[in-house]
Structures are given as structure tokens and as C-alpha cells.
Amino acid sequence: MAPRKRPENQKTPEVVVRPKSKRNRSPRELEPEAKKLCVKGPGSSRRFDSGLWAGLASLRVPPLCSSIVRALHQHKLGTAAWPSLQQGLQQSFLNSLASYRIFQKAAPFDRRATSLAWHPTHPSTLAVGSKGGDILLWNFGIKDKPTFIKGIGAGGSITGMKFNPLNTNQFFTSSMEGTTRLQDFKGNTLRVFASSDTCNVWFCSLDVSVKSRVVVTGDNVGHVILLNMDGRELWNLRMHKKKVTHVALNPCCDWLLATASVDQTVKIWDLRQVRGKSSFLHSLPHRHPVNAAHFSPDGAQLLTTDQKSEIRVYSACQWDCPPSLIPHPHRHFQHLTPIKASWHPRYNLIVVGRYPDPNFKSCSPHELRTIDVFDGSSGKIMYQLYDPESSGIMSLNEFNPMGDTLASVMGYHILVWSPEDAGTQK
């Protein structure tokens, strides 16, 4: 399908650097601001429930852990096992979240942001796609103007993005325009890997394996296509009854593929043995349509996000065992970018945006639209990030490969979180 050009009326990307505050404000000091941002629920008054701040404050200050230096010394002496050392490092990171602030914002799009990808080797560079097909390449570590690639407008939504692991000056995209393609930073199309040639079929997801040199992409009618890096199609099969919302290759066993769908299933496949739609290794039924399925960085777990109120964590060596269930409000809404939970790249932590639901079992009267951090082992909520000046729903939240900077998508806006001192230096 030939790309359509869009009128030259796109606004200039807006990037805002947040100045360092003189001191950290307590939740009590923020309470008057939060009152203005709360949505009045059925039968509720405009009075803000101060008990919510008390609960949030208790989450915002994790208990102190033992000295990391001591833990490293004990590990060196052989008196501390690696898991305990890893747990100590994770707790230290959780403690640092109290200092995280939004230090940069960008609002470059005229339609909401729909996808997000971090550069694999430049920890201050990310790519963000929009519903209009626009793409922003932003290195927030320098003062240069971000690179803006204009899309086609309506019908051009970027549904998936990934930097090319073989050449990080290029990136893959899947889109509602009906293509999965490889582009450079100037917006030139280097190769079209898949094209529907019809407006009724579009691509919703993609992933890339550098080891196997393959690209996998899924469409809105249930097909999954596997191609090599030269663009040659290896197979094209209908693996689901409905839209394939997410495809993910295991980072350690790159022949292991997970596909998620609005048909309320996640399926696990061995790429070496795919013969047809029934050749999956495991089918993991869900109660609701599924937005995403992410393997953990070590490949040992699978994280799924449905379109209602459930996050699941499966063990990759025990697919038949019941998963860990994490109740969490993130319901689907037509004009909201689907909420997807993601892994922290270094610790067994899950990060996901909250969409308060009055019908959710544990919903508070004036619940905030926070970014929630869960322990991947216990399912316990460990921390909640919140900025009253950016109180919208954070649909996408991903840490950079270093694990020290968080990018969030909130409607039209891109937000970058970092420890306050580090953010000021950046």
C-alpha cells in the first residue's frame, strides 16, 4: 500500500524541561492540588479522602534495607547467596523511587501516543509513535531538537516499534497503514516486510530476534507472519481467531514465541515446530481480551495484561501451573491507548499504569492515576509514582535498558522520570 502524505500543518514538537524543585513536597502539601484532579464518583463529594494520601505515603517510602556494600562483601566471602544479594539491590532501587520526578516532557503529536521503544545502547534516546503515524526520535540527554517523522494522519497509527538490533540507526514499525517495515531516522522506508494491500487488514504488533535473524508480526484478523531479515516470508498462519495484540520472542530461547489476542488467549509456540494453528505448545486462557504478553529479561517468566483488571505472571518452565494473579484496574476504553504492564530490565519488578475503576473491588473514592510497581515474585505492590501536574492515565511505562530512567505515555504527552539529582544533571 503506497504511503499517503499528510498536509504540512503539524505543530513543532514541544519539549519542556522541568526545573529542579527546592525541596521534595510531602503528600500532605500536594493534597490541595490533588483535590482539583480527582473525578467525582457516584454518590461521592468533592472532599478529598485524606486516608488515600496516608496509604499512598506509606507506599512512597519503602523500608530501608541493609547496606549494599555489606551485602556485596558477604557475597564475595561466600556467606551470602546471589538471590539475597539481588534482593538487596532490588530493595535499594525501590528506595530510590522516592526521589523520582518528571524532569522532561514532550507533546509533539496532534493525536495520542500509541507505542514506545528505548534505544538499546543509548540510555537517553527513545522512539515514540502516535495514532496519526507520527514518530518522535528523542535524545533528551542533549539540547538538539528531536527528530520528527510525519505520519499520514488518520489511519496511520503506529502499533509497534523496535530498534533494529543489527543497526541501531534503524527501527521497525507495524502500523494501521497496513505495513510492517524497516525505516531509518530520516523516515525513509528501507524494506517493507509485510503489507496487507487492503484497508481492512492492518498490523498490530511486532518483534525481532537478532540471534535467529527473524521478524515476527501479527495482524488484526489473527494471522502471524514470520520473516527473515531479508524480508523473505517463512510462514503466514492464522494462529488466533481475532486480533493479535502482541507478539514476543523469548530473549534467551529465541525459538520460543508468545502471542496474545483479543480472543482471550495467549499461546506459546516453538518456531522450529510450527505446522499450523493447532501446533502451539500451550494455550493460556484468560477471562478477558489480552493487551500484551512480555517475557521477563531472563526469559523465565511471562507477564500478561488483560483489558479489564488482571495481570498474570506465568513460569516458563511450568506453563500448566496456575499463574500468579495480580488484581489491578486498567480497563479498556476506545479512546485510550491500551494499558500494558512491562518488566524492569534488571529486577524482578513489574510497572503498569493505573486506571481507577469504581467497580474494582479495592477502589478508593478518590483513587489517583498512579504508576504502580509490583514485585514479580509475590505480586505485592511496592511503590506508586504520581505527579499531580501530570495526573492523566499512564498507558505505557517502560524503563530504559540501564533501568534508571522511566518513560511514560499519557495521552498526547511523553514523560521522562528520573531521580531528581540525576534528572537535573541530564
From Swiss-Prot:
Post-translational modification: Phosphorylation by ABL1 negatively regulate UV-DDB activity. Ubiquitinated by CUL4A in response to UV irradiation. Ubiquitination appears to both impair DNA-binding and promotes ubiquitin-dependent proteolysis. Degradation of DDB2 at sites of DNA damage may be a prerequisite for their recognition by XPC and subsequent repair. CUL4A-mediated degradation appears to be promoted by ABL1.
GO biological process: DNA repair; nucleotide-excision repair; protein autoubiquitination; protein polyubiquitination; pyrimidine dimer repair; response to UV; UV-damage excision repair
Region feature Required for interaction with DDB1, mapped onto this chain: 67-78, 86-97
Protein name: DNA damage-binding protein 2
Main location class: nucleus
Species classification: Eukaryota, Metazoa, Chordata, Craniata, Vertebrata
Span(s) of short sequence motif DWD box: 255-273
GO molecular function: damaged DNA binding; protein-containing complex binding; ubiquitin-protein transferase activity
Biased composition (Basic and acidic residues): 1-11
GO cellular component assignments: cell junction; Cul4B-RING E3 ubiquitin ligase complex; nucleoplasm; nucleus; site of DNA damage
UniProt-listed PROSITE patterns: WD_REPEATS_1, WD_REPEATS_2, WD_REPEATS_REGION
InterPro entries named in the record: DDB2, WD40/YVTN_repeat-like_dom_sf, WD40_repeat_CS, WD40_repeat_dom_sf, WD40_rpt
Modified residues (N6-acetyllysine): K35, K76
Function: Protein, which is both involved in DNA repair and protein ubiquitination, as part of the UV-DDB complex and DCX (DDB1-CUL4-X-box) complexes, respectively. Core component of the UV-DDB complex (UV-damaged DNA-binding protein complex), a complex that recognizes UV-induced DNA damage and recruit proteins of the nucleotide excision repair pathway (the NER pathway) to initiate DNA repair. The UV-DDB complex preferentially binds to cyclobutane pyrimidine dimers (CPD), 6-4 photoproducts (6-4 PP), apurinic sites and short mismatches.
Record text on subunit structure and interactions: Component of the UV-DDB complex which includes DDB1 and DDB2. The UV-DDB complex interacts with monoubiquitinated histone H2A and binds to XPC via the DDB2 subunit. Component of the DCX (DDB1-CUL4-X-box) E3 ubiquitin-protein ligase complex DDB1-CUL4-ROC1 (also known as CUL4-DDB-ROC1 and CUL4-DDB-RBX1), which includes CUL4A or CUL4B, DDB1, DDB2 and RBX1. DDB2 may function as the substrate recognition module within this complex. The DDB1-CUL4-ROC1 complex may associate with the COP9 signalosome, and this inhibits the E3 ubiquitin-protein ligase activity of the complex.
